[in-house]
Regions:
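Amide-donor transfer/coupling interface in amidating biosynthetic enzymes
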Residues: 156, 276-278, 319-320, 352-484
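Short helix/loop capping segments that flank catalytic or ligand/cofactor-binding pockets
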Residues: 15-18, 33, 39-45, 95-98, ...
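Short cationic amphipathic helices and targeting signals
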Residues: 129-138
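Intein/HINT protein-splicing elements and their conserved insertion hotspots or analogous self-processing inserts
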Residues: 1-7, 11-127, 140-239, 247
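N-terminal beta1-alpha1 cap of cysteine-dependent amidohydrolase-like domains
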Residues: 169-332, 336-349, 356-364, 371, ...
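Solvent-exposed alpha-helices and their adjacent loops that cap or buttress functional pockets
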Residues: 22-26, 39-40, 76-79, 124-129, ...
């Protein structure tokens, strides 16, 4: 039979004005709003499901107009910077929301009194799935806006620096250990992960997820502002080119990073090189992009590399480019695999390193950190000593390096050498390398997808940066070219 499908989308006016589902230890009070205006009913809830039941009554939204008013008022409070954290009440009920607000940090809990919600049955109160919201306000001034809009709310408690969720309700007191329940919460993901992940690494993820904290060290002189060159429209921009193949992606992110750093960026497809329409003779900086060129048939970047090796014009254009002393390149993800497959990073080695399958034997996608080593890389020189967050997304991201570490110019390593922070098991914990001149960089982490503060899954609290430190890699390339 025909099926009616109704889709809805919500517009986010400003992605820089959002609240995250994690309480701020130094923030204000915690509030609850029941958007449903219905009683606390357990029908259709996760609680009913684990008891092998369905229930008789499920909560509904009794007043659509009130729901709209609450939503719009909360949007205004977010826009005005009055809310520090927030989480909807949905699957699992209020207790799940409260716990999840504490899971994403260490030494974080809350002291709560739910008696003002006027529900004697604590089980119903905690596990009913009435649509609602829990939020943390910057200060008490948010209450004035809520009252002015006729919204019923309850101040239910405050955050704490103890890893315990303490709940009171009409004489009942409950203390819940955050770390223990976070493991319980994560266990379902672990059980599914264990069916997909090789070499017992699902257990490593389960053991390490709470230990591999994202700790950053930003460059001392980084101010978070775009270079004036980003706004220039003159003809003095050095020329850069994006290299891509069928199945490539991230070319727009790479082009944008180059442009913001001051480059005039050209799009170059493999057909341009194969036919001779493009020779790269007027290009000083190339970026081979990420993705799944040729659908990874025969392996990542194998087909792309073959297109260079077995097409005379394309091969000559690339070899001539790398032979010039005034050029730079960056290969990111699939582009890294391409340059490694073509032996462009360590051509002097008799036995070459290669990219191979992740130790997990599956595609890895996540947000991790890298430590920039002491280096002579053109692109990363000013980032030496920094530890930065970055996205990874690859199935064959393992640097398999047959020689001793001193034979390679490893310029960045993952923040931790264990899985999942090191997502692939690379030799020497390698995340990025350059050739011996420092001019040609290969990186499995996607620095071009991590250019903006809002790109990062986690960013240092309190910073209001236009761009992240990764923009310096591209700016350094432009400055070097202007001198050469």
């Amino acid at each position: 039979p025909g099926t009616v499908i109704i889709s809805a989308a919500g517009n986010c006016n400003n992605i820089n004005q959002v609240v995250e589902p994690v309480l701020q230890k130094d923030g204000g009070e915690i509030y609850y709003i029941n958007l449903s205006k219905d009683g606390h009913k357990l029908g259709g809830s996760s609680f009913a499901q684990i008891l092998n039941g369905i229930g008789d009554e499920a909560p509904s939204v009794l007043d659509a107009g009130y729901f709209k008013t609450v939503f719009n008022t909360l949007q205004k409070l977010i826009k005005d910077g009055q809310l520090l954290a927030g989480h909807d009440v949905a699957s699992g009920g209020l207790i799940t929301t409260l716990l999840e607000l504490c899971f994403a940090d260490n030494d974080l809990g809350a002291n709560l009194d739910l008696s003002s919600l006027n529900e004697q049955d604590t089980i119903k109160l905690l596990f009913s799935e009435n649509i609602g919201v829990v939020f943390q306000a910057k200060d008490d001034s948010a209450e004035n806006e809520l009252k002015a809009s006729g919204i019923e709310f309850a101040k239910i408690g405050s955050p704490s620096s103890e890893s315990t969720l303490k709940i009171k309700n009409n004489g009942i007191e409950i203390g819940l250990n955050i770390a223990s329940l976070r493991d319980t919460w994560f266990k379902t993901s672990y059980l599914l992960d264990n069916k997909q992940t090789a070499n017992g690494l699902a257990k490593n993820r389960f053991d390490n997820y709470k230990n591999q904290q994202l700790n950053y060290i930003f460059p001392e002189n980084f101010d978070g502002q775009l270079s004036p060159r980003a706004q220039s429209r003159g003809n003095d921009r050095p020329k850069a080119a994006i290299l891509r193949e069928k199945g490539s992606n991230s070319e727009r992110e790479m082009a944008n990073a180059m442009y913001l750093a001051g480059f005039d960026v050209k799009d170059v497809h493999m057909t341009d090189l194969i036919t001779g329409r493009e020779t790269l003779e007027d290009i000083q900086f190339i970026g081979a992009v990420g993705g799944f060129s040729n659908s990874d048939v025969l392996g990542s970047a194998k087909g792309w590399a073959g297109a260079f090796k077995y097409n005379e014009k394309a091969n000559k254009a690339l070899q001539d480019f790398f032979a010039r002393p005034d050029t730079l390149s960056v290969g990111i993800c699939n582009g890294c695999q391409l340059f490694m497959e073509l032996d462009l990073i360590n051509p002097e080695h008799g036995t070459h390193g290669r990219m191979t399958y992740n130790d997990s034997h599956k595609h890895e996608s996540g947000f991790t950190s890298v430590k920039i080593q002491k280096n002579d890389s053109v692109m990363l020189s000013t980032l030496e000593g920094a530890t930065l967050g970055v996205w990874i997304s690859h199935g064959e991201g393992k640097f398999e390096l047959p020689l001793s570490e001193k034979e390679y110019n490893i310029v960045a390593k993952y923040g931790y050498d264990a899985y999942p922070a090191n997502p692939n098991g690379s030799s020497y914990n390698t995340a990025m390398m350059t050739d011996k001149t420092g001019r040609h960089l290969v990186t499995m982490p996607h620095i071009e997808r991590s250019i903006f503060q809002w790109n990062w899954a986690n960013y240092p609290k309190g910073r209001k940066d236009e761009v992240s430190p990764w923009i310096e890699a591209f700016e350094n390339a432009r400055k070097w070219i202007e001198k050469h």
